[in-house]
Amino acid sequence: MTKNIQVLFVCLGNICRSPMAEAVFRNEVEKAGLEARFDTIDSCGTGAWHVGNRPDPRTLEVLKKNGIHTKHLARKLSTSDFKNFDYIFAMDSSNLRNINRVKPQGSRAKVMLFGEYASPGVSKIVDDPYYGGSDGFGDCYIQLVDFSQNFLKSIA
């Protein structure tokens, strides 16, 4: 029997990109009928500025517009995440460096850019939309759907 998969999405503050990735991925898993393959789908940030907060209203707006809801509250990456998750997906190169900097030796988690699952022509880096307008959040959504679908195909 195949072991169930645990996936963690990581950005800087855990209020924009990674909670959107978590919600989008969960939605894509449900649409594909693959819920039984996953034990945990979660997200966190490398920083602790927003711990306990709901996602950015613009993240929630994009999710709602696409029929996706989340109850996520921001949290910070912890050492235990490296033993509890199979995949730790970073949204950008800076996040990836920060994750690898604190990754314990012997960690079982595969740490990588989620964008490694990008379709040709789609940027592998999910830019932080926090300081921009609503368009950036829509762009993130499009990327995250693409990455999610491609990752799910890769494990089928």
Swiss-Prot record:
The keyword Cytoplasm applies. Keywords: Cytoplasm, Hydrolase, Protein phosphatase. Its main location: cytoplasm. GO terms for molecular function: acid phosphatase activity; non-membrane spanning protein tyrosine phosphatase activity; protein tyrosine phosphatase activity. CDD domains: LMWPTP. It holds the Pfam family LMWPc. GO terms for cellular component: cytosol; nucleus. Its EC number is 3.1.3.48, 3.1.3.2. It is found in: Cytoplasm. It catalyses: O-phospho-L-tyrosyl-[protein] + H2O = L-tyrosyl-[protein] + phosphate; a phosphate monoester + H2O = an alcohol + phosphate. The keyword Mitochondrion does not apply. GO terms for biological process: signaling. The active site is at 11 (nucleophile), 17, 128 (proton donor). Transmembrane segments: none annotated. It comes from the Eukaryota. Belongs to the low molecular weight phosphotyrosine protein phosphatase family. PANTHER family: LOW MOLECULAR WEIGHT PHOSPHOTYROSINE PROTEIN PHOSPHATASE, LOW MOLECULAR WEIGHT PROTEIN TYROSINE PHOSPHATASE. May contribute to dephosphorylation of 'Tyr-15' of cdc2. This is Low molecular weight phosphotyrosine protein phosphatase. It comes from Schizosaccharomyces pombe (strain 972 / ATCC 24843) (Fission yeast).
